[in-house]
Amino acid sequence: MEKFKAAMLLAGTGDALGYKNFSWVFCASGVKIQEELKQLGGLENLVLSIDGWPVSNNTLMHIATAESLVSDYWSIEDLYRDMVKRYIDVVDKLQGRRPDPATIEGCAHLKPDNYLLAWHTPFNEKGSGFGAATKAMCIGMRYWKPGRLETLIEVSIESGRMTHNHPTGFLGSLCTALFTSYAIQEKPLAQWGREMLKLLPMAEEYCKKTIRHMAEYQEHWFYFEAKWQFYLEEREIAEENENKPKFPDKYDAEERDKAYKTWSSEGRGGRRGHDAPMIAYDALLGAGGDWKELCNRAMFHGGEGGATGSIAGCLYGLLYGISKVPKSLYQQLEMKERLENLGEKLYHLATMEK
């Protein structure tokens, strides 16, 4: 249970660190961010509180997903209706947090008063952003057992489509949910990427059954898959017998920014649903259990550090717990009790199931 609590809490910590009250989100240089961090006294001397280090809409939407998952819904459709209401409620309260525009636009299409079609939204050409991925980690925590795989796939896709109805967006949601389930199942880290790719045909079959006009999704579907295949080949972990990721000899903040740009679709690492989980995953592969190194790789770079940080923080919590993380980074964190409470509830619900 402690790791579930750590996962929810460190997702918030990673978000707050990478976001830095919006000031680091638009900084395109990881080197500059790390210089500023030194001037602040270094990671271990930061005190994250609501005043200078609030969480962003990533954490608020993740909380909304988790609260739906621990509610007393009586069917999957009922769960979706609850998610719709909670997402709209969050968006209504986002003044001052400068939310992801795709999330705002996606929520505008939700219909909370329409019992049958509440969560059905149209295909959105602009819905490829990271916001679906950063609110879905808890789905993999709720349905982590192998016997719940179909539910995990369905719920992560539908939750993603509510706000980001574009394959690059909602497959990011599937990806982060799968990764959290793999962390709890203790699958070797180097296998996660290829295990996820193996399940994309299953996800596609589900979408073909539930999406009327699948044709407009198809070309974007292959983009997500191709980007991940390219990444796994670059790290030399694409094949079954490849379990030792290969990193460049020089992979400092400047080189990482360059790499993250090549994986992106618009020159800013972590802005989309494919590369936000990718950067978090790459950071975990490179950092292992070293929290400070994870932060350097996933939170402090010239891309969307709040998004990649929240995913990486959550996965780190499930893999390693919270003991190596400085207490000043979470003791005064905004919504700390709420996050820990949700971690506890997710644990109890997931373990109660046979």
Swiss-Prot record:
Loss of function: phenotype: Morpholino knockdown results in defective embryonic cardiogenesis with hearts forming small ventricles that do not beat. Defective endocardial maturation with endocardial cells showing a rounded morphology and no clear lumen forming in the heart. Myofibril assembly is disrupted in the developing ventricle, preventing ventricle outgrowth.
Gene Ontology, cellular component aspect: sarcomere
GO biological process: cardiac chamber ballooning; cardiac myofibril assembly; protein de-ADP-ribosylation
Protein's UniProt keywords contain Cytoplasm: yes
MF (Gene Ontology): ADP-ribosylarginine hydrolase activity; magnesium ion binding
Keywords of this entry: Cytoplasm
InterPro entries: ADP-ribosylarg_hydro (IPR012108), ADP-ribosylglycohydrolase (IPR050792), Ribosyl_crysJ1 (IPR005502), Ribosyl_crysJ1_sf (IPR036705)
PANTHER family: ADP-RIBOSYLGLYCOHYDROLASE, INACTIVE ADP-RIBOSYLTRANSFERASE ARH2
Record family assignment: Belongs to the ADP-ribosylglycohydrolase family.
Known role: Required for myofibril assembly and outgrowth of the cardiac chambers in the developing heart. Appears to be catalytically inactive, showing no activity against O-acetyl-ADP-ribose.
Listed name of the protein: Inactive ADP-ribosyltransferase arh2
